[in-house]
Amino acid sequence: MKQLYTIISLLFLFTHTAWAQQHEIFNQRIRTLQVVGGTNWLSLPVSSLGSEPIHIDFDDMTHDYHRYSYKIEHCDANWNVSASLFESDYLRGFNGNQIIEDVEQSINTNHPYTHYHLAIPNADCQLTMSGNYRLTVYDDNAENEEEGIMFTACWMITEPQPLVKLKLEATSTTDIDIQKTHQQLKMELDHSQLRITHPNQLNIVVLQNGRWDNAVINPKPDYLSAGKMSWQHVRALIFDAGNEYRKFEFLDTDHPTMGIDAIDWDGSDYQVKVMTDNPRPNYVYDEAAKGSFYIRNSDNVENNNTCEYAQIHFTLKAPKQPGDVYLNADWTYGRFLPEYRMEYDEMTKTYHARLFMKQGYYSYQYLMKMEEGSIRLLPSEGNFYQTQNKYNVLVYYRAQSDRTDRLVGYGELK
């Protein structure tokens, strides 16, 4: 038993800085990339082996057909390619030269585009191993492979039956005097079905609202017993509670819908002004989607190829901050890029951003990136323990005979 405690304790001394499941777009033609497990667009892109497919959707902002092929790679818990695996270890069928065949041109839209859809598994390839996956999409008509890379998309596949049991609870009772602004995540993990003999065999990732910028990797448990771990009062699992995500719904080009202040046509684009986001000194419950988005219009028919694109204008009323202010959501793919950075207007004391976006429902928040790279909440957005945050826990395991990490447990607390 003492040896087990030593192994488990060593496990949680290991730290990782490269962990991140992030989609990445390399070509400006690609817009509205969405990766969904089954029909659950409100959660992480997760599915269990042999169950619901992973859906990858995106738009190419032309009406020209492009021959897009894809390659699937298995990744370890740290999102490095599982170099020790052969393709046949994790995939049955074909990989690398298969073409995305589900293609639709937009109909009667101001900006023409072509919508592409891919489901994994499909008739050409089926996944046979749990874990992390990365898909790379190429334009086969490009002059070389580097120029042909359009984007990468990531998702997770769990075991058909979980090999661990997770129990999650969020509470405002914390170990430090911040009960009004923070949440303590408590966890219990039953790993009695696993044989753990080395600290590198188990890896645990904790996410708040699907964010990887504040992910907690391998938090050290405060209670250990045979086959079980427990995190009850762990400082690493105390999160800023923040505030409810903001949201808007752009469904109609003629009439403002939820959260839209005005819609104008300038002769070439629809200019859509989201209502000004004012400071929030008090908590008010509002059911939002924690950064998720859903493409649709008022007709809600053939959304993939009938929705319009428009220039969406965001305005945040706030004092000038010591760091750069960014829009953050699933649809920014967790990336702090210049296009998501807001500009400050000293005259009006407001931040502004304009993004080219497709009709639909969007939820979002504002985050601040400091000069040294840390990410913080904006004081004007509020920080309240009552906030309905979502927590996800991923449990990876590598048996002694395995050559990569498998995803043996997944938990979500809403």
What feature does the model see in each segment?
Residues 77-79, 125, 139-150, 211-212, ...:
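Short acidic/polar inter-strand loop motif in beta-rich domains
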Residues 91-116, 212-219, 224, 311-359, ...:
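Aromatic-rich carbohydrate-binding modules that target alpha-glucans
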Residues 110-140:
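Ligand-binding face of N-terminal immunoglobulin V-set domains in extracellular IgSF glycoproteins
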Residues 272-321, 405-414:
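Basic K/R-rich, polyanion-interacting modules in nucleoproteins and related proteins
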Residues 1-22:
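Bacterial Sec-dependent N-terminal signal peptides
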Residues 24, 157-180, 385-408:
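Low-complexity, Pro/Ser/Thr- and charge-rich linker/hinge segments at domain boundaries
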Residues 28-76, 177-189, 299-314:
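Contiguous beta-strand segments within globular domains
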Residues 197-283:
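Long, internal scaffold/assembly segments composed of regular secondary structure
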